[in-house]
C-alpha cells in the first residue's frame, strides 16, 4: 500500500519537528508533498510585495512566482530533505513530476487541473526511496504555483494510494461551534457550510478530489474522511 503525506509551511518552520511527525507515519511506500506558504509570505515581505488571497489561493504575478520558486526550492525543499536524511529517511527530492493548466480568473500564475507523473514517482518508490515533491507545477509556458492540498490529492490519485494524510497546524475540520469534526464521508456537505472559509476550502476540495479518485481514507488533522465522496 502507498500513502501520501502532505505537510504545510507552518509545520515546516521547524523541519526537525515536522520530520518526527512524518517518521511516525511513513511506514511502507510513502511520498511527501510539501507547501511553504509562511516561507513564501515572509520572502515577499522582504521585498515589499503584498500577499493577496482569493478563495484561499495566493494570487501569483511574476514577482510573486519568483518568490514562490525561491522559497519552495531554495529554502523549504532543501531544509526538509536535509532533515529527513538526518532522521535516516531515504528522501529523494523530485521536481517536474507535477503538471497543471493555468487557472482562469484573477489568480495569475496559479495552476488548476493538477496531475502527477505516476511512472516517475513509482520508479523512486520501487527503489525503497521516499519522493519529496514541492508544490510547483510545469505549465504549458511557465512554472505555476499550485495549491499544496490539490497537489497532494493529485499525487495520491495518480499513485492509487490507500491513504492521504494532511499534516497541518490546525486540529482538523471544525463545525459551526468550533468543535473538531472527528469523522465524515461527505466533504461536499462541509464545502457548502457557511462556517468553512479560507484555506479550509481548497483543503476540502482536495479531500473531495482524492476520495472521488479512489483514495480510501483521507485525514485532515484529527478529522477522518472515509467512504464515498
Q: Which role fits each region the language model picked out?
A:
Residues 1-229:
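C-terminal catalytic "cap/lid" subdomain
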